[in-house]
Amino acid sequence: MSTKHALLSASSASRWLHCPPSARLGENYEDKPSEYAAEGTEAHALGEYKILKSLKRRAVNPAKKLKYFSEEMDECTDGYKDMVLELVMSAGATCDDPQVLIEQRVDFSKWVQEGFGTADALIVTDGNLTICDYKHGKGVA
């Protein structure tokens, strides 16, 4: 996962849409990820693995390398996987070949200057795009 963050990232849009100067103000501070953020990053990796395996794609199980792995993380990522697979099945009802992209780097700079990020899950069908945003965490440090 990339550590570079977009100035106007989708994940912080609520903040910069309500307070536009906050985007540039944040550049003056070092980006120190909290333990909560590290746990969320690991949960995304586990969720990605579970979805890819369920879609019969190659993936390496990250569980042994996860510092914050817990039964709760396991259950939460199962729920995330199940939701994405349900959406994929629904998409298959209206499209012969839905495209499923997991942890996909996206560039939306056409609409937001220097806009880019990583989409947790994208499901593309004929004339439709479903974007899944997995949230995992307990707090802000």
Predicted regions and their residues:
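Metal-dependent nuclease catalytic cores that hydrolyze phosphodiester bonds in DNA/RNA
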Residues: M1-V124, N128-L129
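Short beta-strand-loop-alpha-helix junction that forms the active-site gateway
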Residues: Y134-A141
